Amino acid sequence: MSSRALTWPRTAKSSLLKQQTSSFVGQPKLGTPNCRSFSSTADRPINQSAEFSSSSKSYDRLGRRAKEKLLDREFFLSLLNSASTKREAKSYLARLKAQHPPKAQTEPTTGHSKGTVTQSLPSGVNLGSFYGASRSVYDSPVFRHDSTPLPPPSELPEERLHLALIKIRTPQLLDDTIINGVAKTLSQLSRLGMACCVVVDPGTAGNANTLRRVAAEQAERISIAVDAQPDSKSAHLDSVLSLSPMFPELPTVLSRKALLNPLRDGQIVVVAPIAYTEDVPKAVTISANDAILALTKELAGLAMRPDPDEDPWLTAQKIAKLQKEVSLDRVILLDPLGGIPSFRGPQTSHVFINMEQEFDDIKNELLHVQSSEACTATTPKGGNTFVEDPLERHLDNLQLSQNVLAMLPSASSGIITSPLEVSNSARTPQANPSDVSAVGTRRQRNPLIHNLLTDKPLLSSSLPMSRREAMNRRRGSINTPSSHTTFVKRGMPLTMIPNPRVEVWTAQNRPRLSLDDPSIDLPRLVQLIEDSFNRKLDVQDYLNRVNDRLAGLIIAGEYEGGAILTWELPPGVEDDGSPASEARMVPYLDKFAVLKRSQGAGGVADIVFNAMVRSCFPNGVCWRSRKDNPVNKWYFERSTGTWKLSDTNWTMFWTTPGLTENSQRFSDYEQVCRSIQPSWADDTGVVD
């Protein structure tokens, strides 16, 4: 089979082109040129569940082309629904097209048959001259110099393979409907250019022989479910892992080529956690987590054991070459328990985890709850030998995500969700035939496809719980908040000055801190502000205004985002250090900035905002923004209340509970937001 760079089996690109050229549907299918290879649905029967049409009988009566159009419609509806905006879906398709540019014609044009002039897709859609030159060009003589022959195909660099590594936990406890829904999502990911490698995890309860048998059976079951999807093919690899006598506890990939070849051919690879010993061939059941780590190490190009006598530069070159072959973009853990739960604050689950900042805290939180008597009382018990301690499994998922992402580039991410959530979002909502309006149930977003399109979680982690629940109701989610998908990034460190864990941020113990303190990189802070606001800052004027009022700073990563917070007094109130003066001080967000290149990606804004409202000012903070600021929608969703300041171009936001019930406090907030003067060097008359 040809390489992934040349094979487009019903991908989003071919489907998109087919929709654009629907006027050619009625024309006959002709031969395709040798430069492109398409797999046709006529090569094997189409197996499709009845959910794609109003009934299975009516679907069976459809012709092949009609079925393909129906499948394409289903695919694009799922695609558009999973993206937050149509722009995100369109942007991803553009990136997908850029990753797969049309290959140039390498065969001589002499002797072209007329049949090769007209190209068609596997569905029989005639593209005419959409992809090729006109007939007059083909009929014209072409003169070539053969002194510089093209390199053979084997020497051409292979296209980089984008890959998702997926672990399905205890699939033996899932019914066929859920398995089929997961298989459908995997097929859609493959069509979107994301190759999939699935590892079966039978759990840890039971003896080795039972686990090996269950793992093999479930791998075959998932493989059959994938093959049942239209234009989808699986490859069940049962001898991909090995154990060497020198490292009996560390499995390795036996053959990199045997693993990558089916993935490049567009097949979904299914692997059971079974390794074979190298000295005496014997099948050994290993931990699914060890299998995931071994595959990650191989796919990340880190499994090569260098020769100690080899030049380090040559070793580095070999590793770099391996890393250019594959990009392991996603590590997906499908566990019936869903995402990582949260036991602190109003949220019931972690929507986004910044590993650099939160891993230790979340791990300690889970360990604390696990050791408590309340956890023991709620641990499920029963006769099923495959049921395990739920908190132990959450800890296991958290630790595995951390170990895997530590080996991958910072752009890679992890997703922890339940097979049920993936399966439910993969289903097609059925409209009631008797309903005249023909309005169906709103689709539920697929967390895996949504993340592939946006590299973001389904819900922003900085949204208040009330907003999350409202958005879930709008989307028709049937799951409880506790089953939220958890989006995981290796992330970035977060610095809070002063550390609120050591010194609480209150008006009574204000730090004697200034922005030109040695612990603060002032030039980078200024560059962050100017890049985010796209304006020049009058640095000295700004320092004069805030240095005596600083409450603290929040810095994300290498000054990729940050917040400057101050204690402000309403006009007319003297700062004399008295309790009455301190009681009137207003916690104020003076600057909230994110580098342009980090805006909308990586969760930088969410990381900074969460630190502000959860760690630094948990009792509330206020800020202001221009009434016409496009960021206001983001502010509206995260604030407790807003107030448009009359006779100004400002809108005031706050997170302080019960602010409107305290008229004096509300007036102080308003007066502060009205009175602060901007410190921009380019005084253009714009208030912000």
Curated annotation (Swiss-Prot):
Record's subcellular location: Mitochondrion
Catalytic reactions on record: L-glutamate + acetyl-CoA = N-acetyl-L-glutamate + CoA + H(+)
Top-level taxonomic group: Eukaryota
UniProt keyword annotations, A-Z: Acyltransferase, Amino-acid biosynthesis, Mitochondrion, Transferase, Transit peptide
Positions of region (Disordered): 1-59, 96-119
Gene Ontology molecular functions: L-glutamate N-acetyltransferase activity
Cited InterPro entries: GlcNAc_Synth_fun, Vertebrate-like_GNAT_dom
Pfam families per record: NAT
Principal location: mitochondrion
GO BP of this protein: L-arginine biosynthetic process; ornithine biosynthetic process
Gene Ontology cellular component annotations, sorted alphabetically: mitochondrial matrix
Entry keyword annotation includes Transit peptide: yes
Pathway assigned in UniProt: Amino-acid biosynthesis; L-arginine biosynthesis; N(2)-acetyl-L-ornithine from L-glutamate: step 1/4
Transferase recorded as keyword: yes
N-acetyltransferase domain boundaries: 509-678
Biased composition (Polar residues): 12-25, 34-57, 106-119
EC number(s) given by UniProt: 2.3.1.1
Assigned protein family: Belongs to the acetyltransferase family.
Function: N-acetylglutamate synthase involved in arginine biosynthesis.
Descriptive protein name: Amino-acid acetyltransferase, mitochondrial
Organism, scientific name: Aspergillus flavus (strain ATCC 200026 / FGSC A1120 / IAM 13836 / NRRL 3357 / JCM 12722 / SRRC 167)
Phylogenetic placement of the source organism: Eukaryota, Fungi, Dikarya, Ascomycota, Pezizomycotina
